[in-house]
UniProtKB/Swiss-Prot annotation:
Organism phylogeny: Bacteria, Pseudomonadati, Pseudomonadota, Gammaproteobacteria, Enterobacterales
Name of protein: L-lactate dehydrogenase
CC terms in the record's Gene Ontology section: plasma membrane
Reported cofactor(s): FMN
Originating organism: Klebsiella pneumoniae subsp. pneumoniae (strain ATCC 700721 / MGH 78578)
UniProt cross-references to HAMAP family, sorted A to Z: L_lact_dehydr
Annotated compartments: Cell inner membrane
Main EC class the enzyme belongs to: oxidoreductase
C-alpha cells in the first residue's frame, strides 16, 4: 500500500486492527458531530498565499517550556497506546525522540513510566487525570518525577466519561464484549501476532504498579468509571501545583474564561481541546474555540491545541489561529498501528514536509511569522479567523 498522507495510515489501521480497537480511537461522543467538525472547521480555514518572498532559510524550530523542538508538535497522551502496536508507547516515544519532539505518556498507558523513560534521550511529558484516588495521583507524580519527566499535562475535561456509542457496537463495551473482542482478535492475525501474543503483558502499566496486581481491559473500563471525580475544582489542583516543580499544562480548555482562570491559577500552558470530540458532542471544535482564547490569554500563557489535526497544513492553520504548538493524537496512532515506530517516524516526516510547503507558500520563514496575517480575512473566506471568531461569540 502506498502511504502518502495520514489518511492512508487510517485506512491501513482499519484493516489491521480488531474493530473494538479501531473504533475506540476513531470514534467520538454521541452522534460524533464535534468529531467531524474538528476536521471540517480546520480544513475550511483559508490561508493567504504569498509569492516571491525568498524562502531559502525556512526553519520549523521552536522552543516550548525551555525545550528546543525540531517543529511545533508533540505526541499527545493516548490511552491504551500499547494495544495498537507491540509495546506501542515505547515505539512512539522512540520516533518522537528521534525527531526531536516530546512524547506524552498517558496515565492509562500499557507500558509504565519506568519502561518508557529509559528508552529515550529527551525527557518525556506525563499526563494525569484528576481522580478520586488521590493516593494514585501522588504515586504517579512521584514516579514521573523520579523518571525525569519534564512537563505535566493535566487533563481536566473528564470529570465523567463521555458517552461513546461506537464502543457498544464495536465490542469495547456492551453485551458479550469479551467474547466479541476475542473473536475479532483471532480474525485479525497481524495484530494477534504482533500485539496479542508478542505485546504482552497487556496490563495498564501505571495502574498495575500502584495496585500491585495485573490489570486488563475490564479493569481499565471499571477503574476509570469509578475514579473520575465530578466534584473537582481549581482548588483540587493546588496541591499538585505545589508538588510538581516543572511546567504544568491544563488540557481541555474551550472557553476564554477558563483560559483566564488557568493564567490566574499559575499554569504554564493550556491545551485548547475537546478531547478529540470524545467527551461532549455539540461543543465547539478546537479551531472555532482557539481564536477567542488566543485573544484572551496570548502572551500570558503558552497555548497548545489538538483535535482535528491530520497533516502539516493543519498544524500551520492552528498556529495561525493562535496556538504556539500542537499535539498529535489519532494521526500518529493510525501510523503506529500500521508500521510501528517507523510508521510514526514517517508520519512526522510527512507533517514536516507539509508544514514546509505551507510556510513557503504563505511567506512564513519561521514559526514566529505564522500569524493572523497568514489567514485570508475577507467576506469570501467564511471559515477564516473573523468567521471563526463570530461563530464562537454566537
Amino acid at each position: 500500500m502506498i502511504i502518502s498522507a495520514a489518511s492512508d495510515y487510517r485506512a491501513a489501521a482499519q484493516r489491521i486492527l480488531p474493530p473494538f480497537l479501531f473504533h475506540y480511537i476513531d470514534g467520538g461522543a454521541y452522534a460524533e458531530h464535534t468529531l467531524r467538525r474538528n476536521v471540517e472547521d480546520l480544513s475550511d480555514v483559508a490561508l493567504r498565499q504569498r509569492i516571491l518572498r525568498n524562502m531559502s532559510d525556512l526553519s520549523l524550530e521552536t522552543t516550548l517550556f525551555n525545550e528546543k523542538l525540531a517543529m511545533p508538535t508533540a505526541l499527545a497522551p493516548v490511552g491504551l497506546c500499547g494495544m495498537y502496536a507491540r509495546r506501542g508507547e515505547v515505539q512512539a516515544a522512540g520516533a518522537a525522540d528521534d525527531k526531536g519532539i516530546p512524547f506524552t505518556l498517558s496515565t492509562v498507558s500499557v507500558c509504565p513510566i519506568e519502561e518508557v523513560a529509559p528508552t529515550i534521550k529527551r525527557p518525556m511529558w506525563f499526563q494525569l487525570y484528576v481522580l478520586r484516588d488521590r493516593g494514585f495521583m501522588r504515586n504517579a507524580l512521584e514516579r514521573a518525577k523520579a523518571a525525569g519527566c519534564s512537563t505535566l499535562v493535566f487533563t481536566v475535561d473528564m470529570p465523567t466519561p463521555g458517552a461513546r456509542y461506537r464502543d457498544a457496537h464495536s465490542g469495547m463495551s456492551g453485551p458479550n464484549a469479551a467474547l466479541r473482542r476475542y473473536w475479532q482478535a483471532v480474525t485479525h492475525p497481524q495484530w494477534a501476532w504482533d500485539v496479542g501474543l508478542n505485546g504482552r503483558p497487556h496490563d495498564l502499566g501505571n495502574i498495575s504498579a500502584y495496585l500491585g496486581k495485573p490489570t486488563g481491559l475490564e479493569d481499565y473500563i471499571g477503574w476509570l468509571a469509578n475514579n473520575f471525580d465530578p466534584s473537582i475544582s481549581w482548588k483540587d489542583l493546588e496541591w499538585i501545583r505545589d508538588f510538581w516543580d516543572g511546567p504544568m499544562v491544563i488540557k481541555g480548555i474551550l472557553d476564554p474564561e477558563d483560559a483566564r482562570d488557568a493564567v490566574r491559577f499559575g499554569a504554564d500552558g493550556i491545551v485548547v481541546s475537546n478531547h478529540g470530540g470524545r467527551q461532549l458532542d455539540g461543543v465547539l471544535s478546537s479551531a472555532r474555540a482557539l481564536p477567542a482564547i488566543a485573544d484572551a490569554v496570548k502572551g500570558d500563557i503558552t497555548i497548545l491545541a489538538d483535535s482535528g489535526i491530520r497533516n502539516g497544513l493543519d498544524v500551520v492553520r492552528m498556529i495561525a489561529l493562535g496556538a504556539d504548538s500542537v499535539l498529535l493524537g489519532r494521526a500518529y496512532l493510525y501510523a503506529l498501528a500500521t508500521h510501528g515506530k517507523q510508521g510514526v517516524a514517517n508520519l512526522l516526516n510527512l507533517i514536516e514536509k507539509e508544514m514546509k510547503v505551507a510556510m513557503t507558500l504563505t511567506g512564513a520563514k519561521s514559526i514566529r511569522e505564522i500569524s493572523r496575517d497568514s489567514l485570508v480575512q475577507n467576506a469570501e473566506a467564511l471559515q477564516t479567523f473573523d468567521a471563526l471568531k463570530q461563530n464562537n461569540a454566537a
